[in-house]
């Protein structure tokens, strides 16, 4: 039937129907309830440090090191210098990995005077500098962090089978400490490498530590308790014995512990993982998808409303959203949780008043209690740390310089023991912004030592 007079009305009704359909779609995608994915336990596993070391001892001789790489990235000269310093330390640690790659902002090459000095330094230690375009979102809330998405270029390095990545504002540590909180001084006191991370099960697409400092504690803490020290070690020993008998990569992954409750992950969709150290399996597909998570193209946004980037979202939040979505959508995507007490430590942890979240194992993090703070033994802890991330805001990073007069000194710590000298303390910090006094002098000594260790490297290798 042909409606001539009503044609305008018919067209109008179709426009209303189309608009109404689009509106319903947006409401649905915004309000849809995401049910807990019961397959999470199969695809998200905790990798205890003891297991990582056992895998390395058993399988490192079979690795093709030429297909592996350590990678860092840098968007400015300071971080380029830091990345090169870290890789010089790695070379000194006798790493077996030949490929040390710094992905850097290609615009830095335009400042020939500064760039040439860093290029020459990198050549001396066989460090590869690879220029890349910046990944930036101009709508980001903070210009300081807007270029952090450049980190995602590591996923595009598909010439390598596996990459161990860590932020340039990190430092490798050595672990030989005396019980009196003094460093053992001998020629072998070179920081250890992270080569063992290349031997985690190949089936794992990405492995990261948990952002332990952001963990929310669950009300179930009174009902579920982590095993005591001996009980946990017995479980780990049994696990290692099982894994040592497995030659199948999938079976090894299957035997790894899961989170105690899956809500531990769902309660931290945007900040469960820390991204300052990662083990990744490079993939063009993942790289291209992450760029969409950064820039939110309109067609992609239509079916990814829950993944849209907020102005305050940067590399950590974006990667967490991506991992969360892929774990729900792809049953073949495998994720490992690295031990934060070895690879994910923040320097600021030594200034904290309480350490319950830090001392807990990853799978027990939501169920921590105040009693765990008794397990904070700084000397034992520093002996196990292999990589530490400089994070003490508002205290400046050590290469930015600090003094004893500014407001941030009130966030520092100072030893208050039997030998405390009040006159010396007041002369060192003459303003009202004084460090917090603490009887945890081991933590004070370790924090100061970390800063001093960085300064030694700075004095030797800083070029810019």
From Swiss-Prot:
Glycosylation sites: 180, 186, 248, 310
EC number(s) from the headed UniProt entry: 2.4.1.-
Membrane topology: Single-pass type II membrane protein
Motif window: DXD: 167-169
Residue intervals passing through the bilayer: 15-35
UniProt subcellular location: Golgi apparatus membrane; Vacuole membrane
CDD domains xrefs: GT8_GNT1 (cd06914)
Topology Cytoplasmic: residue spans: 1-14
Membrane topology (Lumenal): 36-464
Keyword Transferase: yes
InterPro entries in the record: GNT1/Glycosyltrans_8 (IPR050587), Nucleotide-diphossugar_trans (IPR029044)
Enzyme class: transferase
Molecular function GO labels: transferase activity
Top-level taxon of the source organism: Eukaryota
Main location: Golgi
GO (cellular component) term, any one: Golgi membrane
Keyword terms, alphabetized: Glycoprotein, Golgi apparatus, Membrane, Signal-anchor, Transferase, Transmembrane, Transmembrane helix, Vacuole
Family the entry assigns: Belongs to the GNT1 family.
Its job: N-acetylglucosaminyltransferase involved in the Golgi-specific modification of N-linked glycans.
Protein name: Glucose N-acetyltransferase 1
Taxonomic lineage from the root: Eukaryota, Fungi, Dikarya, Ascomycota, Saccharomycotina
């Amino acid at each position: 039937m042909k409606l001539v007079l009503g044609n305008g009305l018919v067209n109008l009704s179709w426009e209303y129907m189309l608009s109404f359909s689009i509106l319903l779609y947006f409401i649905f995608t915004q309000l849809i309830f995401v049910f807990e994915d019961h397959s999470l336990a199969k695809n998200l596993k905790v990798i205890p440090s003891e297991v990582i070391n056992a895998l390395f001892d058993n399988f490192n001789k079979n690795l093709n090191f030429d297909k592996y790489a350590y990678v860092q990235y840098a968007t400015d000269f300071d971080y380029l210098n830091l990345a090169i310093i870290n890789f010089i330390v790695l070379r000194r640690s006798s790493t077996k990995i030949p490929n040390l790659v710094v992905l850097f902002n290609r615009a830095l090459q335009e400042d020939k005077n500064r760039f040439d000095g860093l290029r020459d330094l990198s050549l001396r230690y066989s460090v590869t500098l690879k220029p890349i375009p910046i990944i930036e979102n101009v709508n980001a809330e903070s210009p300081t962090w807007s270029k952090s998405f450049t980190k995602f270029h590591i996923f595009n390095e598909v010439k390598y089978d596996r990459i161990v990545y860590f932020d340039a504002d990190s430092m490798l540590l050595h672990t030989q400490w005396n019980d009196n909180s003094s460093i053992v001084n001998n020629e072998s006191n070179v920081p250890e490498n992270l080569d063992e991370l290349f031997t985690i099960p190949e089936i794992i697409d990405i492995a990261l530590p948990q952002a332990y400092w952001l963990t929310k504690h669950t009300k179930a803490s009174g009902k579920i308790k982590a095993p005591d020290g001996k009980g946990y070690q017995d479980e780990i020993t049994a696990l290692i014995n099982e894994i040592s008998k497995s030659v199948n990569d999938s079976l090894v992954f299957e035997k790894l512990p899961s989170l105690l409750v899956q809500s531990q992950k769902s309660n931290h969709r945007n900040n469960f993982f820390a991204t300052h150290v990662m083990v990744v399996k490079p993939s063009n597909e993942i790289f291209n998808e992450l760029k969409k998570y950064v820039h939110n193209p309109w067609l992609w946004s239509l079916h990814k409303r829950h993944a849209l980037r907020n102005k305050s979202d940067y590399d950590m939040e974006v990667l967490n959203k991506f991992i969360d979505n892929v774990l729900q959508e792809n049953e073949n995507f495998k994720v490992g949780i690295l031990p934060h007490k070895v690879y994910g430590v923040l320097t600021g942890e030594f200034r904290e008043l309480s350490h319950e979240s830090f001392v807990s194992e990853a799978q027990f993090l939501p169920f921590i209690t105040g009693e765990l703070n008794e397990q904070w033994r700084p000397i034992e802890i520093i002996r196990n740390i292999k990589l530490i991330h400089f994070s003490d805001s508002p205290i400046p990073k050590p290469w930015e310089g600090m003094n004893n007069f500014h407001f941030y000194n009130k966030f520092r710590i100072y030893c208050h023991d039997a030998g405390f000298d009040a006159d010396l303390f007041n002369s060192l910090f003459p303003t009202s912004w004084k460090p917090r006094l603490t009887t945890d002098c081991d933590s004070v000594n370790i924090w100061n030592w970390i800063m001093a260790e960085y300064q030694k490297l700075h004095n030797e290798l800083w070029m810019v």
